[in-house]
């Protein structure tokens, strides 16, 4: 335990919490324009073609963000909404694109977890 005079000389250091999504600048989401839409392969134990997009945000940042769900209608110059949240098996992907918002449509024929994929409630037969 330090003495009071030691604490007066050198106060306790407050640990700085580093943001996991710095490009959002403490906002819940950010709008951006797709500069490139492509697929990439995940890290070692997994194997797939993951859909990602390089997005230029309104604050000038350029980030790589993940497009969740089956199938999408994104292309270059599409306007999208970007939220935080990384993809564990894709290095450098620290953001997600919000489905069913702006230019990105929701997942077609989605029955469960619809709100996460911007899918409307199916019509009763």
UniProtKB/Swiss-Prot annotation:
CDD domains: Ribosomal_S12 (cd03368). InterPro entries: NA-bd_OB-fold (IPR012340), Ribosomal_uS12 (IPR006032), Ribosomal_uS12_bac (IPR005679). Keywords: Methylation, Ribonucleoprotein, Ribosomal protein, RNA-binding, rRNA-binding, tRNA-binding. It holds the Pfam family Ribosom_S12_S23. GO terms for biological process: translation. GO terms for cellular component: small ribosomal subunit. The modification 3-methylthioaspartic acid is found at residue 89. The keyword Ribosomal protein applies. One of its GO terms (molecular function) is rRNA binding. With S4 and S5 plays an important role in translational accuracy. PANTHER family: 30S RIBOSOMAL PROTEIN S12 FAMILY MEMBER. Belongs to the universal ribosomal protein uS12 family. Part of the 30S ribosomal subunit. Contacts proteins S8 and S17. May interact with IF1 in the 30S initiation complex. This is Small ribosomal subunit protein uS12. The gene is rpsL.
């Amino acid at each position: 335990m330090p003495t009071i005079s030691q604490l007066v000389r050198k106060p306790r250091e407050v640990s700085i919490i580093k943001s996991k999504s710095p490009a959002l600048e403490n906002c819940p989401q950010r709008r951006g324009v797709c500069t490139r839409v492509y697929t990439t392969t995940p890290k070692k134990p997994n194997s797939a073609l993951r859909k990602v997009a390089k997005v230029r945000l309104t604050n000038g940042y350029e980030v790589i963000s993940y497009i969740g769900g089956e199938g999408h209608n994104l292309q270059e110059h599409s306007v999208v909404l970007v939220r935080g949240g990384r993809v564990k098996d894709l290095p450098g992907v620290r953001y997600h694109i919000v489905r069913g918002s702006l230019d990105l449509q929701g997942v077609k024929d989605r029955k469960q977890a619809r709100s996460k994929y911007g899918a409307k409630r199916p019509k009763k037969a």
